Amino acid sequence: MPDDFDAIVVGSGPNGLAAAVTLTAAGLRVLVIEGAATVGGGCRTEKLTLPGFWHDVCSAAHPLAMASPFFRQFGLAARGVRLVSAPVEFAQPLDGGRAAVVTRSVTETAERLGADGRAYRRLFGPLTDDAAALTELLLSPIRRPPARVTPGLVPFSMNGLRSAAGIARRFRTPEARALLSGAAAHGMLPLTSVPTGAVGLMLTTLAHAFGWPVAEGGSARITQAMADAVTAAGGRIETGHWVRSLAELPPARAVLLDVTPRALLAMAGGQLPVGYRDALRRFRYGAGVCKVDFALAGPVPWLNDSCRQAGTLHLGGTFEEIAAAEAAVAAGRHPDAPYVLITQPGVADPSRAPAGCQTLWA
């Protein structure tokens, strides 16, 4: 392959690889450059603890691998990637052995919520029925109003512009309020802030419509399939090459940077408008996260059976307790009882660990 390209992609996370897949499929000459030894960015799988235990380095559950327009067209299954879901998509343990539980079925989930069952069905039924159109809209560039109003767009717009705390007022039971808080807390914002309503609604809708699956064998299977598609179409991938400046890149008609704001400023600052450079310097990263990988001798003995069957768990207690924890983080304090996101890949994918053992992502 010649050393001049139609496009160079710096960074091989899922976004960078998606760009490379799209460009090579169009017949363009593409070079992907990755600083790490392997492709994938946060979507990688490595042996981080004991022999025989495979752990996802960052991303673990992948509802958007089922839902996004790109992946629906890319066809992971046809490329040998199996996405597998646990019997329970996510659960949230509560005191006394109780739990808030979300399964693929809106009806089954609602039946577990007692007095809040009807309100839950009214909220998530229309959203789930229209999940594909909603996902495509939310993942598209915001250039113009949608060409058509789909059935789920109106209820999502009305509720998605509210905070999780505002939506939670629809519910009376601790279980219904808790499951909304666990999903909304993925936004890493106070639950009184407006974006958290949309986060909670969309993630719960995805659980019902597509599931929260893991990739059999590890998240790296997803990005490796994307990398294989790039090279099969004539693209080239270089790993172990940290780009310090755009000046070191070979000639290309376009350069796409799948990097952080600070990395963009470092490698391209001199070629960016002054106002944009200042915006990059002012960019504030979100709250810090500590992630721990466990190699377990067996499954976690949760008190609630549904928690033992869950692929993902949200720890933190009731809506009020999780709201207090997220508010403390936003105020720059360490909460006494932090919100903890857990994935149990082995519930759906026993291949991650030796027989009888499991991995835990927390």
Regions found by a protein language model. Give the residues of each.
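Mid-domain catalytic core of redox enzymes
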Residues: 235, 239-354
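Helix-rich C-terminal "cap"/substrate-channel and partner-interaction subdomain
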Residues: 121-146, 263, 338-361
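N-terminal glycine-rich phosphate/pyrophosphate-binding loop and immediately adjacent elements
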Residues: 3-133
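Residues forming anionic-ligand binding surfaces in small-molecule and nucleic-acid pockets
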Residues: 196-207, 355-358, 362
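Short, well-ordered coil/turn residues at beta-beta hairpins
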Residues: 11, 170, 258-259
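Rossmann-like flavin
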Residues: 95-195
